[in-house]
Amino acid sequence: MAELTIRPEEIRDALDAFVASYDPGTAAREEVGRVTDAGDGIAHVEGLPSVMANELLRFQDGTLGLAQNLDVRDIGVVVLGDYAGIEEGQEVHRTGEVLSVPVGDNFLGRVVDPLGAPIDGLGPIEAETRRALELQAPSVMQRQEVREPLQTGIKAIDAMIPVGRGQRQLIIGDRQTGKSAIAIDTIINQKANWESGDPKQQVRCIYVAIGQKGSTIAAVRRSLEEAGAMEYTTIVAAPASDPAGFKYLAPYTGSSIGQHWMYGGKHVLIVFDDLSKQAEAYRAVSLLLRRPPGREAYPGDVFYLHSRLLERCAKLSDELGGGSMTGLPFIETKGNDVSAYIPTNVISITDGQIFLQSDLFNANQRPAIDVGISVSRVGGAAQTKAIKGISGTLKLDLAQFRAMEAFAMFASDLDQASRNQLARGARLVELLKQPQYTPFSLEEQVVSIWAGTTGQLDSVEVSDISRFEREFLEYVKRNHAGVMQGIRETKQFSDGAKDELKKAVDAFKPQFSGGSKGSNVPKDVDAGATDADDISQEKITTRKGGATAARG
């Protein structure tokens, strides 16, 4: 028997020759898979041993699919589109590409689906390039701390729970508590920055609608158009009628569009409305792919689903252009329970949360922010000096007011200090109420909150606070425009401005008429009653044939 001799150099040369002649594209063209079963938006395919994770596959009818489960025998594929025409035995071909979406400035003002295709009937979109959906978030060294404010235009948020550029701020609450209203107002408030033309101030907005009714998405678009905000906004829509795969991918599509701008040195605001429905869609996809279920039937990697998405929101270092992407993820709770599985997951990922309480909403406190449980982990670092200087104790004052209010319900006698605290707290609560689609500018917020926290409103009836605020702001704009301009340009609230505003309050109060039917009439104007002879009257007489009117 001949002796077997192993020569390492021959093996090495053979491997080198094979590697040199290997063409990965050849394998992709030659492999043809077959559908073994299909249904509910999922297909299982055999015969594609070289397929990549998240690779796009093309079915026989042209429909695309996303390779998810790479098992030994077959591949679990999420069908991206109508799956009614996919049947057992059909051919499946590789594309050699991972899932990507088109991106660019031409997406501003448009509504697209999770694959980046326009669905607003305004024609095709010319993309600048394509960007993969699954990309690594910026590393620690590629980031910098959040210190630039992103003004929402909502007094309660900008004063007590500030949001900075690059921050992830969770908005959480039951359904119908005003979560979407906060996002829409925040987008509308960026209009002044956009019209300034300064790239350092402009904020491009992305609204990702996941699992909502088509009529709701249309209403959001209409609201943004009426406010002139669609020109700097992109809507990524995955309505309730879409397959679960689309609802699972929609947030990643929005973040890919935003990352293109962020790495270009621009500022982005992205709203995920809402991630609860994305988690439910991912649970449906995972169960159909026969992945083992965990708590509440969610797959074991549901935390990673949201963490790898939200970690893409960041403030980039100056070496990378200093761009930012600010995230406002929404989570819907059941019965105000923030300790459920998905809410606690997202709370642990984000940089703070704004909790909207249904009881406050039903009590006409809108926005219905629960100050006690809401927090921003960035805090004053993301506030302008003007707001920070006047709102330092506002959150504490409101929390103490809520505690005192609950105590006063059972107490028959309160000392004067407690009564004063309750009176001012009630006025602060009324002051922080804000109708939808009426964002406040920085200088308006400063003047309004200064008046409340310094006791200038203590002599105004609670029912008149809203009207007093509105008319006083108009008075200041008309007679003390320099104060407003100084706050707007310097972002600071000087002692001189405070003194001038104090004089303005003292001059305005005598002119202000309280009461629900009052009007702002100066006292030196004679507002006497009109004589009866000067009034044209009508006399009505009734008879059997009907009523006749005779002018007196």
Swiss-Prot record:
SUPFAM superfamilies, per the entry: C-terminal domain of alpha and beta subunits of F1 ATP synthase, N-terminal domain of alpha and beta subunits of F1 ATP synthase, P-loop containing nucleoside triphosphate hydrolases
Reactions catalysed according to its record: ATP + H2O + 4 H(+)(in) = ADP + phosphate + 5 H(+)(out)
Site (Required for activity): 374
GO annotation, cellular component aspect: plasma membrane; proton-transporting ATP synthase complex
Membrane topology: Peripheral membrane protein
Protein family (similarity comment): Belongs to the ATPase alpha/beta chains family.
Function of the molecule: Produces ATP from ADP in the presence of a proton gradient across the membrane. The alpha chain is a regulatory subunit.
Subunit structure: F-type ATPases have 2 components, CF(1) - the catalytic core - and CF(0) - the membrane proton channel. CF(1) has five subunits: alpha(3), beta(3), gamma(1), delta(1), epsilon(1). CF(0) has three main subunits: a(1), b(2) and c(9-12). The alpha and beta chains form an alternating ring which encloses part of the gamma chain. CF(1) is attached to CF(0) by a central stalk formed by the gamma and epsilon chains, while a peripheral stalk is formed by the delta and b chains.
Protein name per UniProt: ATP synthase subunit alpha
Organism name: Kineococcus radiotolerans (strain ATCC BAA-149 / DSM 14245 / SRS30216)
